[in-house]
Amino acid sequence: MAREYKIEDYRNFGIMAHIDAGKTTMTERILFYTGKNHKIGETHDGASTMDWMEQEQERGITITSAATTTFWQGQDGKKRRFNIIDTPGHVDFTIEVERSLRVLDGAIALLDANAGVEPQTETVWRQAEKYHVPRMVFVNKMDKIGADFYRCVEMVGSRLGAVALPVQLPIGAENEFEGVIDLIEMKALTWDGTIGAAATVGEIPEHLKDQAEEYREKLIELAVEIDEAAMEAYLEGTMPTNEQLRALIRKGTIEVKFHPILCGTAFKNRGVQPLLDAVVEFLPAPTDVPAIKGIDVKTETETTRESSDEAPLSMLAFKIMNDPFVGSLTFARIYSGKLTKGVSLENTVKGKRERIGRMLQMHSNSREDIEEAFAGDIVALAGLKETTTGDTLCDPLKPVILERMEFPDPVIEIAIEPKTKADQEKMGIALNRLAAEDPSFRVKSDEESGQTIIAGMGELHLDILVDRMKREFKVEANVGAPQVAYRESITRQAEIDYTHKKQSGGSGQFARVKIIFEPHDGDDFIFESKIVGGSVPKEYIPGVQKGIESVMGAGPLAGFPMLGVKATLIDGAYHDVDSSVLAFEIASRAAFREGAQKAGAQLLEPIMKVEVVTPEDYVGDVIGDLNSRRGQISGTEARGIATVVNANVPLANMFGYVNNLRSMSQGRAQYTMQFDHYEPVPTAVAQEIQKKFA
């Protein structure tokens, strides 16, 4: 089977926005107009196609990015292939946005015409900057009360620090909104609002002609700056033709020099078709963006893979999903080469082979089996055993590791336990499945309490995972309050001489150990034996180490694991009959418990590296608040039009911070935090913790 669409006719793009900017409705309209959907699903009916998990339909927010393939016939009469990735707009799901931006070539940023640039728009925009993704802006909900296109254009400059390039102007606003002025063709496009209606092309209304002329002039001035020859011709009085103007806008958009701005209302079916034409005209094909970089596994040097079917096969797994019918599905973007069903591929990150069983083309929640896929395609693969998000799959003869995705460490953890014995086993399976799907979600077992601890990016993130466990895996669980992972250590040297003796008829137990315990700089446990002359026989020494290690998990102050301890065995004694590995294990355990007390045990707490990105107006409040949380400010710097505040803050004082920050900055500041190091807890705080846990 040969390639049906040339790679130049592909557009891989996503729609990104703040929660409630109308993203799902827009995707629905796109799917409708491109002929994939016969009935439009409205978000407020809970019947939308892209939001296919039950909770998304209930909450009316998009959580998982579903990938959809669809087709559009442009104004030139040529059919193009669109691969659309839907992304969530809630701050706890930024990981989903990151992973979808990673595999896109372009994006449409949706703005609510009334609210303009909202906090999550800023976050997502910054993430797109990081991956250098070309973007257009669509000002949606132009029919809403308070809709203001020109304010939105101004905010793209002032809030996002981006160059706005309006290619359309609205005709009317709020309930008077009728259509748009196309500034390239200088025509008015109006719609009667019925579903599927084509635009009526007419002359620009008299009262808007001057404004349209003024904005067209600005458009041309910005566009010709992209190309020296066009600039010279323009300065000499030659205007670019409409075709040349489109080519200049395309070039500037792909080079991320500016962002075309369009407008309309997806819900009322006005402005959707021109947006689809703009995707074709201004957003890049896979061949228009730089070739993906990677590391050649054989030579360990940097290499690139061109977007071509002839290049060796390379693809990136960007999402894993559990499908109720097919099981585990791995979504992957093919960057180069050709993929055939049944072939064996190398997972270069894991060093394992994977065989491609079923290969599917996804349409939101329906699917079709395919035999072959090509460079530029986004496919879903069934039956992969080892592959997780961010892994590279490639031709085993030409192995490469593509740029890896970076995932933040979880910042909040809660204890979770099954409600019944029957839920116990199901919970383990459910949590492992969810962790395989979502790299920002971790599961571990707390050895002291026997509880299962889950960790994630925020409270909503964990809420939804617990909820999914209930629905998809039918597991009922009790959830605890968020917790901090404290540690313990020692502050000075202590020498302990301990004898373990037990005699009760028959063979007894005997072991004597002399051990020096001292702190060291690392976090790990170091054991050393300085026994000479056989005072402790060689075969018993591993028992001494094992005994100490077995009690390192629970320190003397509040039962937290111990860090940074060195133990040196310097002397001991044994009995020919009564000594054993077990006896030395018991002796060293008791020696450690005594030694930890004498060596000045102390509590340690996790210190987080916190970065707050805030508009200038709130810097003082942000710094004051971080100081009140026992934070230490390490510096501030300007980033675009925002200020970045860096600080080290104890995790214990960061719970509920997101809500504080939102109210302090009217929702305009965001923060990220990750674990940095452990530090001794101040005495007053340590006493509180000991009371609570001892």
Swiss-Prot record:
Q: Does Lipid biosynthesis count among this protein's keywords?
A: no
Q: Which UniProt keywords apply?
A: Cytoplasm, Elongation factor, GTP-binding, Nucleotide-binding, Protein biosynthesis
Q: Where is this protein localized, as stated in its record? A: Cytoplasm
Known SMART domains for this protein?
A: EFG_C, EFG_IV
Primary subcellular site in the record, as a coarse category: cytoplasm
Q: What range(s) does the tr-type G domain occupy?
A: 8-287
Against Pfam families, the record matches this protein to:
EFG_C (PF00679), EFG_III (PF14492), EFG_IV (PF03764), GTP_EFTU (PF00009), GTP_EFTU_D2 (PF03144)
* Biological process annotations from GO: ribosome disassembly
Q: Which CDD domains match?
A: EF-G, EFG_III, EFG_mtEFG1_IV, EFG_mtEFG_C, EFG_mtEFG_II
Positions contributing to GTP binding: 17-24, 86-90, 140-143
Query: Is Ligase there in the keyword field?
Result: no
Question: Which ranges does the record mark as transmembrane?
Answer: none
Say what the protein does: Catalyzes the GTP-dependent ribosomal translocation step during translation elongation. During this step, the ribosome changes from the pre-translocational (PRE) to the post-translocational (POST) state as the newly formed A-site-bound peptidyl-tRNA and P-site-bound deacylated tRNA move to the P and E sites, respectively. Catalyzes the coordinated movement of the two tRNA molecules, the mRNA and conformational changes in the ribosome.
User: Which PANTHER family does the UniProt record give?
Assistant: RIBOSOME-RELEASING FACTOR 2, MITOCHONDRIAL, TRANSLATION ELONGATION FACTOR G-RELATED
Query: What name goes with this protein?
Result: Elongation factor G
The protein's organism comes out as: Brucella anthropi (strain ATCC 49188 / DSM 6882 / CCUG 24695 / JCM 21032 / LMG 3331 / NBRC 15819 / NCTC 12168 / Alc 37)
